[in-house]
Amino acid sequence: MAAKIRREDEIIVLAGKDKGKRAKVSQVLPTGKLIVEGINLVKKHQKPNPQLGVTGGVIEKEAPIQTSNVAIFNQATGKADRVGFRFEDGKKVRFFKSNSELIK
């Protein structure tokens, strides 16, 4: 099945501590989760490793967020939207359900 949300898509968060924020998807995981730039930041306590040149301390990194908690952002309407699929010229393409415009 084709992915409704892909890398580099602009999304809006629907639920959680970052609700309402917009950002770009940096990675789509096979478990149905996304890594989104600047969203769902967690603090990780990093142990120093001199052999690898890694300094220790508390670092902030992006944790995965469930796909169901985000929606693709439609620039034309300025709102969250749903994704549909259709065939055009023998190719499967994604489109916004609200105004039928193609995504990218």
Swiss-Prot record:
Protein origin, superkingdom: Bacteria
Gene Ontology annotations for the cellular component aspect, listed alphabetically: ribonucleoprotein complex; ribosome
Entry keyword RNA-binding: yes
Keywords from the UniProt entry: Ribonucleoprotein, Ribosomal protein, RNA-binding, rRNA-binding
Annotated GO biological process: translation
One family name in Pfam for this protein: ribosomal_L24
Gene3D superfamilies named in the record: 2.30.30.30
GO MF term (any one): rRNA binding
InterPro entries: KOW, Rib_uL2_dom2, Ribosomal_uL24, Ribosomal_uL24_CS, Ribosomal_uL24_KOW, Translation_prot_SH3-like_sf
Cytoplasm listed as a keyword: no
Function according to Swiss-Prot or TrEMBL: One of two assembly initiator proteins, it binds directly to the 5'-end of the 23S rRNA, where it nucleates assembly of the 50S subunit. One of the proteins that surrounds the polypeptide exit tunnel on the outside of the subunit.
Family (UniProt): Belongs to the universal ribosomal protein uL24 family.
Subunit structure and binding partners: Part of the 50S ribosomal subunit.
Name the UniProt record assigns to this protein: Large ribosomal subunit protein uL24
Gene that this polypeptide is encoded by: rplX
